[in-house]
């Protein structure tokens, strides 16, 4: 429900429709008592999108370079599959280790802040007062009143202080969540990385492998179509307009595919083979 609300609200914003925006907020307020759920599992979404884009562009670049060099289809497939799984494993493991490091750091900072709030409450309050005055331009009296009110709820004060002082948003993530993100990265990289490779294999099943420019065109078109769709999907969770986001993905993919292909052709020509 929260996810759909954000999508509807953004659509109203892009259209500049104030009445529609009010209607959406009122509708979802009655459904969930205004629990907006802005996160949308954003960490999972970020992992999937990053893995998908990295997978398809990385393998597209590898296949393009191989096709440009006009090596045999069997060699292209071997190189492509090898790089696909090697990169997917590397990306998945990197996502897992970075997530666990972030969780460990956040928990350590939380424990430190909890200890300071318990043992040095006056100093902790003063830190927040200074933040309200210097960052948000509250006067001293209002800043002190805000701190006294928020300090009554220690959990809220802790979360708010970590956000303002350290730039950390407390979550309920644990090591199992980090493992899940690593798996998501691996799977999304593999799935979308297979698209340029699979389109190349399909072309060579039905057409001559000697026409490497045609095989590149098939890989190029299938990849850009996929990137366009991924861009449209990504736009639902960003501030970019759908067509702008989609075209930026296409431009990125075009450059990433054309350069290796041209270098492959150049190297093949200079080698004299």
UniProtKB/Swiss-Prot annotation:
Binding of Fe cation 1, residues: 113, 116, 124, 127, 165
Vacuolar-side positions: 69-72, 203-212, 268-273
Protein residues bound to Fe cation 3: 116, 124, 127
Biological process annotations from GO: intracellular manganese ion homeostasis; iron ion transport
InterPro entries (alphabetical): Ccc1_fam
Membrane association type: Multi-pass membrane protein
Record's subcellular location: Vacuole membrane; Endoplasmic reticulum membrane
Topology Cytoplasmic: residue spans: 1-47, 94-181, 234-246
Chain positions recorded as Fe cation 2 binding sites: 113, 124, 127, 161
GO molecular function, one term: manganese ion transmembrane transporter activity
TM spans (from-to): 48-68, 73-93, 182-202, 213-233, 247-267
Reactions catalysed, as given in the entry: Fe(2+)(in) = Fe(2+)(out)
Keyword Ion transport carried by entry: yes
GO cellular component, one term: vacuolar membrane
Reported phenotype of the disruption mutant: Non-essential during asexual blood stages. Parasites yield lower levels of parasitemia and liver infection. Moderate reduction in size of developing exoerythrocytic parasite forms. Increased labile iron pools in blood stages. Increased sensitivity to iron overload in liver stages. Decreased sensitivity to iron chelating conditions in liver stages. No significant defects during transmission to or development within Anopheles stephensi mosquitoes.
Function field: Vacuolar iron transporter involved in the transfer of iron ions from the cytosol to the vacuole for intracellular iron storage. Involved in detoxification of excess iron. The transport mechanism is not well defined and the role of protons is not clear.
Subunit structure: Monomer.
Classification via PANTHER family: FE(2+)/MN(2+) TRANSPORTER PCL1
Family: Belongs to the CCC1 family.
Record protein name field: Vacuolar iron transporter
Species for this entry: Plasmodium berghei (strain Anka)
Gene expressing this chain: VIT
């Amino acid at each position: 429900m929260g996810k759909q609300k954000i999508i509807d609200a953004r659509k109203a914003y892009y259209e500049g429709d104030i009445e529609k925006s009010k209607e959406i907020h009122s509708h979802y307020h009655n459904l969930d008592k205004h629990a907006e759920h802005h996160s949308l599992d954003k960490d999972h979404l970020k992992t999937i999108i990053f893995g998908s884009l990295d997978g398809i562009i990385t393998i597209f670049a590898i296949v393009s370079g191989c096709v440009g060099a006009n090596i045999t289809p069997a060699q292209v497939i071997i190189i492509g599959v090898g790089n696909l799984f090697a990169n997917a494993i590397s990306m998945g493991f990197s996502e897992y280790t970075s997530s666990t490091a972030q969780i460990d750091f956040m928990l350590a900072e939380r424990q430190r802040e909890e200890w300071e709030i318990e043992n040095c409450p006056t100093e902790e309050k003063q830190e927040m007062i200074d933040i309200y005055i210097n960052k948000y331009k509250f006067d001293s009296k209002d800043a002190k009143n805000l701190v006294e009110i928020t300090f009554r709820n220690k959990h809220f004060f802790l979360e708010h202080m970590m956000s303002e002082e350290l730039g950390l948003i407390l979550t309920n993530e644990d090591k199992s969540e980090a493992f899940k993100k690593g798996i998501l990265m691996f799977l999304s990289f593999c799935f979308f990385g297979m698209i340029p490779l699979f389109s190349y294999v399909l072309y060579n099943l039905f057409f001559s492998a000697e026409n490497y420019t045609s095989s590149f065109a098939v890989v190029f078109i299938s990849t850009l179509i996929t990137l366009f769709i991924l861009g449209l999907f990504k736009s639902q969770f960003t501030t970019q307009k759908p067509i702008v986001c989609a075209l930026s993905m296409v431009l990125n993919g075009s450059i990433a595919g054309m350069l290796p292909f041209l270098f492959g052709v150049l190297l093949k020509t200079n080698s004299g083979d």
